């Protein structure tokens, strides 16, 4: 359900929105704002996913050392 919301914008963003509408890329100022909010939502979703991954890593404890030679030797032994 849509609702009208009043937002105060400075001259920079007002000019930017006007240019997007006048250039034909968007039909209305609301279209421009919705596009910007979709991008912000996508960005915030990615940031949250990264934060969640970092939290999982942090909670998993200290990393174990990795020896590539031992790993390769084990893979050759197991898989020929």
From Swiss-Prot:
Gene: parD
Alphabetical keyword list: Toxin-antitoxin system
UniProt name for this protein: Antitoxin ParD
Presence of keyword Amino-acid biosynthesis: no
One BP term from GO: regulation of DNA-templated transcription
InterPro entries: ParD (IPR022789), ParD_sf (IPR038296), Ribbon_hlx_hlx (IPR010985)
PANTHER family: ANTITOXIN PARD
Family indicated by similarity: Belongs to the ParD antitoxin family.
UniProt function note: Antitoxin component of a type II toxin-antitoxin (TA) system. Neutralizes the effect of toxin ParE.
Record carries keyword Membrane: no
């Amino acid at each position: 359900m849509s609702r009208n919301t009043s937002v105060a914008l400075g001259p920079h963003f007002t000019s930017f929105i006007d240019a997007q509408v006048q250039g034909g890329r968007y039909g209305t100022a609301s279209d421009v704002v919705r596009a910007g909010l979709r991008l912000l939502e996508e960005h915030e979703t990615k940031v949250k996913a990264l934060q969640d991954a970092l939290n999982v890593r942090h909670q998993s404890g200290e990393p174990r050392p990795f020896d590539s030679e031992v790993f390769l030797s084990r893979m050759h032994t197991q898989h020929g």
